Design a protein with these regions (language model features):
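Divalent metal-coordination and catalytic microenvironments
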Residues: 3, 21, 29-30, 53, ...
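Active-site metal-binding loops of divalent metal-dependent hydrolases
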Residues: 8-9, 26, 31-33, 54, ...
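Active-site metal-binding motif and surrounding structural segment of the metallo-beta-lactamase
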Residues: 35-82, 177-178
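Metallo-beta-lactamase
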Residues: 85-143, 241-255
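Conserved beta-strand hairpin/beta-sheet module of binuclear metal-dependent hydrolase folds
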Residues: 1-42, 144-162
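Cap/insert and terminal regions of metallo-dependent hydrolase folds
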Residues: 164-254
Length: 256
């Protein structure tokens, strides 16, 4: 499985885009502003999107994506997956005919271009060549991370979170983990803000990574614009025993 980073920043500005990852050309993990880095032809290949939570930096691209590839979706609806809370938020606050048209009814209810699907944590789901699982994490709105496993390897994504046991305990129940994408939004001087907004800083992340029995390659994402150098320098001090580096936009990771 090819894992392409479309956006991984904690904000926008210049060439920075928010969270969106492309898996094997057809699947998105979150749909932030990074989706705009795809060509229209690439967008038309997308068949499914898995969401971690309902915050705008992770969903902002979805309404415009559906509109842009509307003609393509008339032959096969775009499948959107997420927790019950995330799906409800999208239906209630975005596709409500006020912020954006309800594409689950367009062109007709029986032949709509958009379909919402609720997933349950702890269940394994097959998506093309890989299996995936939603894992609850600790953020200010209901949020899940994901673990993907293909024939040749495995990857986990923490989504937005702070100190928790659920994510790390579940990963430890598996025999292996090759890659870990984990957020670290703020520097250590903002530790109280991290606790309030439920994000990681290097100190909190280092403490949680120590719970993990595996030694995956670690990629740091969701850094606040302008603070990247400080956060990564602090990560070098706080995270011991892991090969750790900053995730880059347009980076491709081969999990197979």
């Amino acid at each position: 499985m090819k894992f392409r980073v479309l956006g991984c920043s904690g904000g926008i500005g210049g060439d920075l885009s928010t969270t969106s990852f492309l898996l094997d050309d057809h699947i998105l993990l979150d749909c932030g502003t990074g989706i705009s880095n795809l060509t229209l032809a690439e967008m038309k290949q997308i068949r499914a999107i898995y969401f971690t939570h309902s915050h705008l930096d992770h969903i902002a691209g979805l309404p415009l994506l559906v509109d842009s590839i509307f003609d393509t979706l008339q032959s096969e609806a775009l499948q959107v997956y997420g927790s019950k809370e995330t799906i409800t938020a999208l239906q209630t606050h975005i596709f409500n005919n006020i912020i954006w048209p309800d594409f689950t009814l367009i062109p007709t209810k029986d032949n709509a271009v958009l379909s919402f699907n609720i997933l349950e944590p702890g269940q394994l789901y097959q998506q093309q060549t890989c299996k995936l699982e939603m894992i609850p994490v600790n953020h200010v709105v209901p949020t899940v991370g994901y673990r993907f496993e293909c024939a040749g390897g495995s990857m986990a994504f923490s989504a937005d979170t702070t100190t928790n046991d659920s994510f790390w305990d579940r990963l430890n129940q598996y025999d292996s983990l090759d890659y870990l994408l984990v957020e670290c939004a703020f520097s250590n001087k903002e530790i109280e803000l991290c606790r309030l907004a439920r994000h990681y800083c290097p100190e909190l992340l280092g403490a949680d990574l120590a719970k993990l029995k595996h030694k995956p390659k670690v990629y740091i994402s969701h850094l606040k614009p302008g603070s990247e150098a400080v956060i990564m320098a602090e990560c070098e001090q706080a995270i011991k025993g892991f090969d750790c580096q900053k995730l880059q936009s347009d980076q491709v990771i081969d999990i197979s």
